[in-house]
């Protein structure tokens, strides 16, 4: 079916319940929603309503931060957030429920502990021309070329197979970005 999250949905929900019950904060580091392969947010929320329900619990408890990545860069637009992230339709109550009303979705986040030590969080696509500046082109290629190939069984040619030189260059650029 092309849904890479479906097989892990129950594992995600169980982990999120544990983290919520034990006082953790949830930080989504981008690409939480595959918006290159999928044109709309609504079917994602409908399919994974349990995941969005528990994420909304974190949000209501002020224990959630969301960053956007290259695959969900449209979340950087306030108009997208207002239209797709404020509420969702819940079948069990046959009506709309709050999702993340008023959420701000950022490109990066700095955490600071009581000793003033800082940790810089970012999705990681920054510094890569295709995934950062040319993401609309990359989205087109994924949506209309890669996804159909994936549906017939081709494996992703990205990720860990990158040459070390390229990884080192991107790491230097991200350090400069920080």
Predicted regions and their residues:
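Extended recognition/assembly regions associated with phosphoester-bond processing machinery
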Residues: 1-28, 32-178
């Amino acid at each position: 079916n092309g849904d890479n999250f479906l097989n892990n949905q129950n594992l995600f929900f169980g982990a999120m319940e544990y983290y919520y019950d034990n006082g953790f904060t949830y930080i989504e580091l981008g690409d939480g929603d595959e918006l290159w392969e999928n044109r709309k947010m609504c079917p994602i929320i409908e399919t994974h309503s349990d995941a969005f329900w528990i994420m909304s619990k974190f949000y209501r408890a002020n224990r959630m931060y969301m960053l956007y990545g290259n695959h969900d860069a449209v979340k950087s637009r306030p108009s997208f957030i207002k239209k797709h992230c404020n509420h969702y339709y819940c079948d069990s109550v046959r009506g709309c429920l709050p999702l993340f009303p008023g959420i701000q979705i950022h490109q990066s986040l700095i955490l600071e502990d009581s000793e003033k030590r800082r940790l810089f969080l970012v999705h990681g696509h920054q510094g890569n021309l295709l995934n950062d500046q040319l993401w609309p082109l990359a989205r087109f290629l994924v949506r209309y070329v890669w996804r159909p190939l994936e549906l017939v069984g081709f494996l992703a040619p990205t990720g860990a197979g990158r040459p070390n030189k390229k990884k080192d260059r991107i790491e230097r650029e991200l350090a400069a970005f920080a």
